[in-house]
Amino acid sequence: MKNASALPMNDQLATPATVLRIDRFTCPLAHWLAFAERLAFIDGHLRSHPHCRMSRVASSERDGQVYVITIAEWDSRDALLAAKQEMAAVYAENGFDPAAFLSQHGIESEFTTFETMVL
């Protein structure tokens, strides 16, 4: 009888596993344009990064809020970590503090990293 479990066996993990960075934001509509500009800036850098396989931004507006998710797929966890350091340097060069920006604009955020798998 075949294994009926919906969970993968160890040999079913994607090889090599890619990494998904999925971020969620809730942005007050009044600050959406400023936030959208930052998202476009970041997305432009990600799309040109040699180890970023895919970058997408999606949004939904309701009740005076804009709900946003960003999804980026990376070759590896090391590639993601290196890209985060590169972006931190770009932010520093431009005098941009992401945490302060989010706080000043009342934007709530959640950042999560997942490893891909084959089911």
Where are these regions (language model features)?
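An amphipathic, aromatic/His-enriched active-site/gating alpha helix that lines ligand/cofactor pockets
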Residues: 2-4, 14, 41-53, 73-110, ...
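Low-complexity intrinsically disordered segments
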Residues: 6, 67, 109-113
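Short beta-strand/turn micro-motifs at beta-sheet edges
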Residues: 7-13, 56-59
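Short, well-ordered beta-strand segments in beta-rich or mixed alpha/beta enzyme
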Residues: 19-26, 55-87
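Short amphipathic
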Residues: 22-24, 111-115
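Residues that cap or initiate secondary-structure elements
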Residues: 29-31, 78, 117
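A short acidic, often aromatic-flanked loop/helix-cap motif at beta-alpha or helix-coil junctions
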Residues: 63-64, 114-119
